[in-house]
Regions:
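Conserved beta-strand-loop-alpha-helix hinge in the C-terminal portion
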Residues: 229-253
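The feature captures the beta-strand-to-loop junction immediately N-terminal to the Walker
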Residues: 41-43
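Helix-to-loop junction immediately C-terminal to a conserved catalytic motif
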Residues: 56
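A short, flexible loop at the N-terminus of ABC-type nucleotide-binding domains that lies
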Residues: 2-4, 13-27, 77
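H-loop/switch region of ABC-family ATPase nucleotide-binding domains
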Residues: 209-210
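ABC ATPase NBD coupling module
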Residues: 72-86, 91-94, 116-119, 123, ...
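Conserved ABC transporter NBD signature motif
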Residues: 64-72, 232-234
Length: 260
């Protein structure tokens, strides 16, 4: 397979130059191939969300390189990376504008890569296209285009955020615990929608999750992080033969090794 993302010798510190300086990553290496769906698990503070922040451009590394399709994007602005990297956050409120309608949010997202961010008048053809996209959610959102997004439930809003993140032709999708704030039923619904969109559009995806069942059941690769390191990296038959109990055993072993 072709390499999409390569992180080389990356070091990242918080509180640099202060008594509270903390290195999250030190000489960290990581690669992602095109078409992979990588589930990332790990304890709090292991570097999972920091990794997504570095890839999206909301955080710049102290040293090292981030290569995207062999282009060095280490210092590229976040808004420029947003043209080819989509992201869905844990908080459903971050993926859409509450005061705008579903239609207005989708039209805004649709104009993301247009010159000067111009938003053209929405034609009947585009409205039909939006309805087709929303019908995948199986929540009836396609019939509520005039509804203010702020009135939607968390699950509905997160499903909308997923659709919006995939409206333009992105090369990489980042999911940052995107089901964590939802009730169990909504969480399962959004996860099934996630898998459907990724499979149909063949989008390379990194999904940070605390849900070990989702990490085991979904994706083509499973990475476990601890203290800025990848301590497990499973794919193929190795991932297929892994279960939740096996992952919990690894977590327990790590805790014992670290004296926790």
């Amino acid at each position: 397979m072709l390499l999409l993302l390569k992180i080389e010798d990356m070091t990242v510190s918080f509180g640099k130059g202060t008594p509270d300086e903390h290195k999250v990553f030190e000489h960290f290496d990581f690669t992602v191939e095109k078409g992979e769906f990588v589930s990332i698990v790990g304890s709090n503070g292991s570097g999972k969300t920091t990794l997504l922040n570095l890839i999206s451009g909301s955080l710049i590394p102290d040293s090292g390189r981030i290569l995207f399709e062999n282009r060095d994007i280490s210092r590229q602005k976040e808004y420029k990376r947003a043209r080819y990297i989509g992201r869905v956050f844990q908080d459903p409120q971050k993926g859409s504008c509450a005061d705008l309608t579903i239609l207005e949010n989708m039209a805004l997202a649709d104009s993301k890569n247009r010159p000067f961010g111009l938003t053209p008048a929405v034609s009947k053809k585009r409205i039909k296209h939006y309805q087709e996209l929303l019908s995948q959610c199986a929540m009836g959102l396609e019939n509520r285009l005039g509804t203010k997004v702020g009135t939607l439930s968390g699950g509905q809003r997160q499903a909308l955020a997923l659709v919006i993140a995939n409206m333009t032709d992105i090369d990489l999708l980042l999911l940052d615990e995107h089901t964590a704030a939802l009730d169990p039923k909504s969480s399962q619904t959004v996860m099934e929608l996630t898998e459907k969109l990724i499979r149909e559009k063949q989008i390379t995806t990194l999904m940070v999750t605390h849900n070990l069942r989702f990490a085991v059941e979904y994706g083509t690769r499973l990475v476990m992080m601890h203290e800025g390191r990848c301590v497990r990296d499973l794919s193929g038959a190795e991932k297929a033969n892994t279960d939740i109990d096996a992952l919990l055993d690894v977590f327990n072993d790590i805790s014992i090794e670290c004296g926790n």
